[in-house]
Amino acid sequence: VISYITGHAICRGYIDGIHSTLDWDIFDNTIYDNAKLIDVLNMASGIHNYHDGENFINSKRWPNQHSIQSIMKKELKNSVAGENKYYYANTNTNVVASYLIHKMGWKNYKKMLKEIFNDKVGIENNVVMHRQNKSNRGQHTLTYGMFMTRYDYMRVAVAMLNDWNNNTCEGQYLKDLYENKISKGDEYNPNNSSQSMSNSKYYAGQFYVGMNGDERPIFIMSGFGGQNINIDFENNKIISIMSIHRNFDWMKLVNSNF
């Protein structure tokens, strides 16, 4: 969902586009210095030498507790980006979320969220976003954490489907993400296809794509526990599962229907 929000920021002119270079002095002399937005969205920032997939290797700190500013000063100070390849690290999403606030300011960011979720998506309940609990009030820092009802998540998926089909600016953003997808390399494991993240061959700007290795534009969002939303843009189909645990047959309930 952070990526979808990013598309709206681009369409409002706050960011030049997915190929723009991150412009924030806190990134100086870190792996994000001169990084392209699309590489960060694609989990290809080169952070794999410093991050174990959940925590930072040298400090064991969890990125969802500490501000982006703190992380750049401690864990990633004088860091050098590794190979440009897919490596899932939630820090990348936190960087994008925080970068939006840096470019927009909190006031404009909150205004845009209202325009997206209330006016466009039509949510019926609140959306709660999670900021790092050890950050300072007013800091331009945010995590990927987001809470909303299962029906409001579905409404977001419908809005994405409509954007794609109506070729809105945000819809073109989603198509650009798909055109700039990257291979997941060894992370693609069709022999262990019980989960969407294993079954998808590519990654496109925060979305799993390439179900069964196919080239059809089906976007997959995998969240906490058993949260799973699948959007088939060509066939106007959405399948959403909002279970607490992931102990369900994904191939039977989801994959077999595409």
Indicate where each model-derived feature is located.
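Active-site helix/loop module of the DD-peptidase/beta-lactamase fold
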Residues: 11-48, 75-78, 104-143
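Active-site SXXK
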Residues: 1-17, 40, 96-100, 153-156
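Carbohydrate-binding/catalytic loop surfaces
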Residues: 57-65, 131-147, 192-197, 202-205
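Active-site-proximal alpha-helical segments within enzyme catalytic domains
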Residues: 92-99, 144-166, 227-244
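Active-site-proximal binding-pocket segments
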Residues: 112-183
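Structural recognition of the beta-strand scaffold that forms the well-ordered cores
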Residues: 39-42, 87, 125-129, 145-147, ...
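Active-site Gly/Thr loop motif
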Residues: 123-131, 179-239
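Short, gly/Ser/Thr-rich active-site loops of penicillin-recognizing serine hydrolases
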Residues: 249-258
